């Protein structure tokens, strides 16, 4: 939830900024020259298609791609999980996309929450000015730096930062992207997690659909309107097929082709693409630490291991994302 009301924002600003909160689909991912940032799916009004006690089914005519986009959010009895499916029909060509939950860490003391993701091939800091001082924006991570451990990410000053501890580095705005390892029999899904005070939030995905995870680390580094240095302690933990948050035109240039990492997907007018994720919460004991693994524990259940060695089980149909 952004620290401003929609009515405080200039009419010229994108709708997305006016109501910045929660979780939203980005199709395509990133800014566009002649359309709103992150696409109509993140800015336009959705229609109610169907609903019920445990289902919300929404739809959207996308004027930019010509696609019919559906969002299905489902709850299941006895579970603390949201099953999210996006169906995209009628699009043609290569598009980037992503799911964009924004987690609010402002209730946590500095550095006390723990953020982690499933094993990744490599990580990168955005290779340019994600936060440009010309626009009164400031970043602290070393542009373009590659890393293999979120606890050791190069700073522009020469030291390393531990990105698993948050909130941290107030006054800065940074973007990193991790390329997930492919699925195995033992690890059929990829995951992201944030451990808070007594509970954790986690998401599950198919790495073939969402090959990368982006962390948008937003802790007061933007000083132009509507940010005004007050968007503190937030983090977008975003599952994407994109090149960072660059435009779809840049993603179509395959900037990571040499690494074998797709940044767009081919859509065909005569087919429907289904993109599925699960977001869930679970209680954790004190001193659980950052999540080090989330693996299947049989059908309809996962076991989550913390840095302390403690484990918790959560009822989640992980097969939904495969």
Name each region found by the language model.
Residues 1-83, 94-322:
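Surface-exposed acidic/polar loop and edge beta-strand patches at domain peripheries
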Residues 86-91:
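Asparagine-centered strand-capping/turn motif at beta-strand->loop junctions
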């Amino acid at each position: 939830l952004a620290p401003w009301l929609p009515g405080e924002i200039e009419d010229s600003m994108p709708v997305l900024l006016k109501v910045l909160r929660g979780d939203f689909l980005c199709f395509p991912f990133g800014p566009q020259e002649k359309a709103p940032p992150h696409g109509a799916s993140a800015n336009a009004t959705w229609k109610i298609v169907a609903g019920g006690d445990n289902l919300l089914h929404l739809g959207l005519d996308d004027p930019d791609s010509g696609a019919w986009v559906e969002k299905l959010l489902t709850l299941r009895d006895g579970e603390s999980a949201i099953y999210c499916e996006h169906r995209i029909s009628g699009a043609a060509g290569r598009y980037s996309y992503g799911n964009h939950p924004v987690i609010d860490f402002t209730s946590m003391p500095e550095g006390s929450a723990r953020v982690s993701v499933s094993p990744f091939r490599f990580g990168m800091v955005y290779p340019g000015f994600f936060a440009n001082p010309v626009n009164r924006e400031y970043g602290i991570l070393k542009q373009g730096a590659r890393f293999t451990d979120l606890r050791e990410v190069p700073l522009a000053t020469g030291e390393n930062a531990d990105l698993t501890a948050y909130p941290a580095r107030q006054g800065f705005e940074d973007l990193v992207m991790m390329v997930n390892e492919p699925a195995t029999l033992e690890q059929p899904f990829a995951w992201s997690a944030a451990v808070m005070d007594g509970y954790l939030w986690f998401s599950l995905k198919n790495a073939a659909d969402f090959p990368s995870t982006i962390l948008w680390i937003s802790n007061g580094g933007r000083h132009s309107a509507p940010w005004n240095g007050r968007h503190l302690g937030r983090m977008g933990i975003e599952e994407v097929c994109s090149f960072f948050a660059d435009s779809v035109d840049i993603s179509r240039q395959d900037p990571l082709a040499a690494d074998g990492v797709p940044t767009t997907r081919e859509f065909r007018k005569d087919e429907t693409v289904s993109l599925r994720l699960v977001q869930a919460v679970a209680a954790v004991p004190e001193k659980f630490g950052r999540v080090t693994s989330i693996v299947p524990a049989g059908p309809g259940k996962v076991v989550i291991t913390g840095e302390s060695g403690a484990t918790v089980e959560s009822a989640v149909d992980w097969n939904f994302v495969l």
